[in-house]
Amino acid sequence: PMLDAQADKKWATLQDTPLEFTITRENYSDEMTETVIENKKLNKLLKDNNIEVISKDYLGARVGIVNKEGTNYILKVKDYLPLMAENMPYKDKYTQVISSKDDISQTMVDVDLIEVAGDVGAFRAGITLAENLPNNDKLSLTIGGGRRNVYHRQIRFATSEDAKKKIQERLDNILVKKFHKYYDDTMDHPFTIGHENGHSLGPKEGCEALGKYKSIIEENKADMVSLSMLDLLTKEGLYTKEERDKIIVTFATDNMLKTKPKLSQAHRVRTVMQNYYFLLHKAIKISKDGFLSVNIDKMVEVAYKMLTEIIEVQLSGDFKRGEKYVKDYFVWTPEMKTIAKKLKKISKRLNGTTEQKLADYLFEEKI
């Protein structure tokens, strides 16, 4: 394990490299280990014997070419990370991977993917826009290691005419017309940058006690970091007012799902929780016929409120509290269901496979 940790620590320092090679080790797919927390007798035995339960890793691989121009854009946010850390709720009650006082242990690269395999390339709903690794449970973070953000260029670009047509069709069917001018699919990228760096902010220890809810709560936290810091970063000059508004509306629109997720789907469960939370606090509104309106001026304020509650749950290390928090907000409303039906009519596809033509070409040794 310590060799893995040393490798992770070194990998997270590599900034100026032409290629990206990653063996991903994430445990979102392990639905069994985290349930140990719910067995009180077993959980007590483990604690009495100082045994920490860590979810099983699923191995994946990623190979890509680092895009220098894209990387330089991403690195702009690095100057603002200490300020973001300083503005986190309850910042004095935990240690962050990024702090306002220490060197920033965070590298970032923008990558054109060549190959994804194993867990990364599995048949599923989609490949994430980026990854921030190693995760909190990894040993390297206990020996001074940092983290590395890798952004996937092809995943965020909608280049085909069919893709652009589908986007417009979605807007026409679910978003109130006056908000169309604020929707910009390129604004997913700055939001994702905030999300990935959000994983390096907040508590990095104690979250394992939240069991099967830890990933849902952590993903929720990362989103709310990105959203709640928008006003701060706009004031500091990283974003314009127009970009801020576009990020907010694009986020809210893309948060609408075409089916109710299972509790094991952390990324999608957190989306339902956010939608319900924003509905309750009147930051968004969904009409009975399934059209979304966004209270642009209220979104950041409500996001910070949700972020504060999430940090409280993480700091508690209380499984029951985490369970209650998820169940309180994982509510699939009739309005969400109406939007989902409309989205399904546009596209029924839930999962997909990858095409890797360059990798196939290279594998066949044609060059």
Predicted regions located by residue number:
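Contiguous, non-catalytic segments that form substrate-binding/exosite surfaces or channel walls
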Residues: 2-176, 184
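Sec/Tat-exported extracytoplasmic proteins
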Residues: 6, 85-88, 197, 201, ...
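Short, glycine/acidic-rich hinge or "gate" loops at secondary-structure transitions
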Residues: 12-14, 96-100, 209-211, 235-250
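Extended, compositionally biased alpha-helical segments that mediate assembly or anchoring
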Residues: 46, 55-57, 76-78, 99-101, ...
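Alpha-helix capping and helix-loop boundary segments enriched in small/acidic/polar residues
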Residues: 177-188, 209-220, 240-243
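Active-site recognition of the HExxH zinc-binding catalytic motif
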Residues: 190-207, 222, 227
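An active-site-proximal "capping" alpha-helix that borders the catalytic cofactor pocket
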Residues: 215-232
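Long, well-structured alpha-helical subdomains associated
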Residues: 227-332
